[in-house]
């Protein structure tokens, strides 16, 4: 274990030469990426409950997204982690949240040192919900309640929506890009500013900042969008969750806007056979892509993109200037 100083914090890192990807990308390189992207990434994860996907043994060879649509199965040896692990440093922010699974003691990434600490635990993927912790008011023992069916004055609120585009069997990220362009036109017509992001796999997410709203209302908006797209373009979009019906079509996974769900954070790495990153992109890049490789970005690519273009997801950080969620 080697002690390092990060932003005034002292923490230990280990096994820096250990490959975490089949091609040899090491833990040290993962840590370096998260340390260097932190200033750009942290505003998108700060004040949000963090779910981590850890790969302590590294990403197994042959780990790819399935060609069937739907949820990607966990790679052997990987696991999701919600509770703060044993040994969490005292300086790491934590927030207990009452969920259907019980009270979860979430980690919250507030500073670069937290991202470095998580990278040292081989937490390659970082997932966050669309609501923020500080918008709610904790109850007894500091526990925050998730939004339920009935509104309460203490529940946390969503400040963005995500349209998660899930391509069915036989489709790839180019199909997701085409779908994103169509969805963005609808969202812009509703007064929102759509922000596209590649998932680091076959999908694309379209985000938009919103004035604080109840998570069930954000979910209902994206569900309506799902139905509208399937009605307008039934040959390309499908409203059903059925894997069979989704073959060759795009499904808008509106359930990603539920309070209990989370999506891959902007600039998070992905646990795939090759190190890739969930990357904010421009609409011109989506429209002009001719190969899946045009929308696949490595950690080095992303760092270079940020140096050249800055944060392409900056419109998600509008705060009080965000548009109100369209009503039903």
What are the residue ranges of the model-derived segments?
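Flexible loop/turn segments at secondary-structure boundaries
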Residues: 20, 59-62, 73, 203-204, ...
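Short, contiguous, pocket-lining structural segments
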Residues: 175, 198-200, 217
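C-terminal accessory nucleic-acid interaction domains of nucleic acid-metabolism proteins
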Residues: 1-25, 29-32, 39-42, 46, ...
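Short beta-strand
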Residues: 53-55, 194-200, 240-244
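Catalytic palm subdomain of template-directed nucleic-acid polymerases
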Residues: 207-218
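Basic, nucleic-acid-interacting segments
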Residues: 37-184, 191, 245, 287-293, ...
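Short, conserved phosphate-binding/catalytic loop or strand-edge motifs used
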Residues: 198-208
């Amino acid at each position: 274990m080697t002690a390092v100083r990060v932003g005034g914090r002292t923490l230990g890192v280990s096994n820096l030469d250990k490959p975490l990807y089949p091609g040899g990308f090491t833990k040290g390189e993962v840590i370096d990426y998260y340390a260097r992207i932190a200033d750009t990434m942290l505003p998108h994860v700060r004040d949000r409950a963090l779910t981590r996907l850890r790969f302590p043994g590294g990403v197994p060879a042959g780990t790819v997204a399935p060609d069937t649509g739907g949820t990607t199965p966990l790679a052997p040896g990987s696991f999701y982690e919600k509770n703060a692990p044993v040994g969490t440093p005292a300086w790491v922010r934590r927030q207990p949240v009452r969920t259907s699974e019980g009270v979860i003691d979430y980690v919250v990434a507030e500073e670069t040192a937290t991202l470095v600490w998580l990278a040292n635990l081989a937490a390659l993927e970082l997932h966050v919900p669309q609501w923020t912790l500080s918008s709610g008011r904790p109850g007894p023992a500091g526990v925050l309640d998730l939004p339920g069916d009935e509104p309460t004055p203490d529940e946390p609120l969503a400040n963005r929506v995500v349209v998660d585009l899930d391509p069915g069997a036989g489709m790839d990220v180019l199909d997701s890009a085409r779908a994103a362009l169509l969805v963005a036109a609808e969202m812009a017509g509703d007064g929102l500013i759509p922000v596209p992001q590649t998932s680091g796999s076959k999908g694309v997410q379209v985000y938009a900042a919103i004035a604080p709203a109840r998570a069930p209302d954000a979910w209902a908006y994206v569900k309506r969008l799902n139905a509208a797209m399937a009605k307008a373009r039934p040959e390309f979009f499908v409203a059903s969750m059925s894997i069979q019906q989704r073959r060759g079509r795009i499904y808008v996974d509106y359930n990603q806007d539920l309070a209990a769900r989370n999506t891959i954070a902007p600039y998070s790495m992905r646990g795939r056979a090759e190190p890739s990153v969930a990357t904010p992109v421009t609409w011109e890049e989506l429209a002009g892509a001719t190969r899946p490789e045009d929308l696949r970005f490595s950690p080095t690519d992303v760092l270079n993109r940020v140096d050249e273009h800055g944060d392409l997801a900056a419109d998600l950080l509008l705060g009080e200037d965000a548009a109100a969620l369209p009503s039903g």
